[in-house]
């Protein structure tokens, strides 16, 4: 049984070939922004800037907004000062989109697939979706610190984003923590953005809460990557070695049904704690136990936004 639990450690150390082409085919999903963007750039989301759009904002004097094509006859007739009134609309604008990725040691866990490879696919799908919507996309990777080599400012450079994210298929750093997460919010812009936070969230709840507070100006979508082999597929009977991928520490346990049940219960309790914490910040979590599926992401926005 000892070898069974060590497989995740051994698999995490194996090199994975670069999957640039596979990452590029990460299917996009549909997302919804629940606020009005103040961007001056034309996009697909409701905005606050005056311009071409379908969001009616009222009427104004023709002298102040000389566009006779938008003349409002009814309001013009009703105007006590006999001024010609024209309709005003808010233009559809862009919204900043970020994918924030946990690159700590625990993301090297491999069940059927390495967690980090799943995160790469999700981050690429976020980039694809932002590109389809005409939005700006940025990427931030962190472990013990925010990694500049895996941090991209907001841009429409789709190919650079895809190529940089794909490099993470060859990222295999073990025994490394996640302390940089508390500095990560400093790399987000000041404009309200949609932030996809991709992690297994195997970190203290106090750290998560502190980070959410620092990102309170943004809309955060926590994507929780858990693998059934972490807790559901433990041995029912026999010796096993549990290894912490972030510290390298290991502990040998004698497994029996009661011990396995405690692990499962602990994960369920952890999930409830995470869900409660995220809901306090109006950021319901999306738990992913298997492969990335775009319909799950789309459904999330249909239910949560």
Predicted segments — roles?
Residues 2-42, 60-66, 75-77, 86-88, ...:
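Exposed, interaction-prone extracellular/peripheral surfaces
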Residues 54-55:
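Charged, amphipathic alpha-helical linkers/stalks
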Residues 72:
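Short, Gly/Ser/Thr-enriched beta-strand-loop segments that form substrate-interacting elements
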């Amino acid at each position: 049984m000892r070898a069974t639990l060590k497989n995740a450690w051994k698999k995490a150390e194996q090199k994975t070939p670069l999957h640039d082409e596979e990452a590029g085919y990460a299917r996009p999903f549909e997302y919804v922004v629940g606020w009005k963007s103040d961007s001056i750039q034309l996009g697909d989301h409701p905005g606050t800037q005056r311009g071409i759009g379908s969001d009616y904002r009222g009427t104004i004097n023709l002298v102040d907004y000389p566009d006779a094509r938008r003349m409002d006859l009814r309001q013009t007739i009703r105007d006590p000062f006999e001024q010609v009134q024209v309709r005003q609309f808010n233009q559809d604008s862009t919204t900043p989109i970020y994918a924030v990725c946990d690159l700590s040691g625990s993301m090297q866990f491999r069940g059927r697939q390495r967690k980090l490879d799943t995160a790469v696919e999700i981050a690429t799908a976020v980039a694809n979706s932002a590109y389809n919507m005409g939005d700006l996309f940025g990427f931030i990777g962190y472990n013990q610190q925010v990694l500049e080599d895996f941090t991209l400012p907001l841009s429409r450079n789709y190919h650079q984003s895809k190529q940089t994210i794909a490099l993470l298929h060859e990222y295999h750093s073990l025994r490394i923590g996640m302390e940089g997460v508390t500095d990560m919010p400093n790399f987000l812009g000041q404009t309200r953005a949609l932030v996809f936070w991709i992690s297994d969230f195997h970190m203290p709840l106090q750290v998560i809460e502190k980070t959410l507070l620092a990102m309170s100006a943004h809309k955060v979508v926590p994507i929780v990557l858990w693998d059934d082999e972490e807790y559901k597929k433990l041995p029912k009977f026999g010796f096993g070695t549990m290894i912490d991928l972030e510290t390298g520490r290991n502990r040998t346990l004698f497994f029996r049904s009661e011990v396995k049940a405690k692990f499962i219960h602990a994960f369920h309790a952890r999930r409830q704690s995470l869900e409660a914490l995220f809901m306090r910040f109006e950021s319901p979590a999306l738990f992913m136990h298997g492969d990335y599926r775009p319909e799950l992401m789309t459904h999330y926005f249909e239910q949560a936004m």
